[in-house]
C-alpha cells in the first residue's frame, strides 16, 4: 500500500504491480484543536518505552503556544509524568487519524503506516527513526521534502525542527 511517488525506483516495476496508495480508515472520534498549532508526538506502538525522550519533549514544549498531544503506548505509565503543563496532553493511545486531521506537525518514529497517514493528511513530519526500515522511510520523506530528520532524541532538537517546519 504505497504510491509510485513514495516508492523508490517505481519506474522499474512492471505493470503487474499496482501502486494503490495507503489504506486510510475513517476517524472514530473528533479531536478539539485548542490552539493555533497542534503538535502530535507518537513513537509507535511497539518500541515506545521512551520516558526520557517524552519528558525532554515536555520540557522543551511546555512554555510554547503549541497544543501538544502525545501518545506514549502502554510501556510507560501516564502517572509517571506527574503534573503536566496546560498545553500538553499525554495518553496511552489516541485515534491517530483524528489527531492527524487537525495536526500541524507530527513527531514520529517513521513507521510506514504513520508516515502514510501523515502524508495523506498533508502533515509534515519531524522524524526520529529507530530501525533500519524506519530510517529508509525517513530518507524517502526527506527526499520528498515532507519532513525533517532529527538525529538526536532530545527535546531541543525536536523543538528546533518543529519551529523550522512551522516557519516554512
Regions found by a protein language model. Give the residues of each.
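Donor-nucleotide binding loops and adjacent catalytic segments primarily
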Residues: 6-105
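Nucleotide-activated sugar donor-binding and catalytic core shared by glycosyltransferases
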Residues: 2, 7, 57, 78-168
Amino acid at each position: 500500500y504505497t504510491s509510485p511517488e513514495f516508492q523508490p525506483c517505481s519506474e522499474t516495476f512492471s505493470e503487474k504491480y499496482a501502486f494503490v496508495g495507503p489504506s486510510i480508515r475513517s476517524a472514530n472520534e473528533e479531536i478539539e484543536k485548542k490552539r493555533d498549532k497542534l503538535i502530535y508526538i507518537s513513537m509507535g506502538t511497539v518500541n515506545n518505552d521512551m520516558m526520557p525522550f517524552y519528558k525532554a519533549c515536555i520540557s522543551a514544549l511546555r512554555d510554547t503556544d503549541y497544543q501538544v498531544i502525545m501518545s506514549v503506548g502502554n510501556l510507560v505509565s501516564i502517572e509517571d509524568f506527574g503534573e503536566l503543563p496546560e498545553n500538553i496532553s499525554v495518553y496511552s493511545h489516541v485515534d491517530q487519524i483524528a489527531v492527524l486531521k487537525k495536526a500541524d506537525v507530527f513527531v514520529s518514529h517513521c513507521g510506514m503506516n504513520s508516515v502514510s497517514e501523515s502524508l495523506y493528511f498533508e502533515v509534515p513530519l519531524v522524524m526520529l527513526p529507530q530501525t533500519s526500515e524506519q530510517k529508509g522511510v525517513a530518507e524517502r520523506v526527506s527526499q520528498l521534502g515532507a519532513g525533517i530528520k532529527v538525529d538526536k532524541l532530545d527535546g531541543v532538537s525536536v523543538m528546533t525542527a518543529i519551529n523550522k517546519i512551522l516557519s516554512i
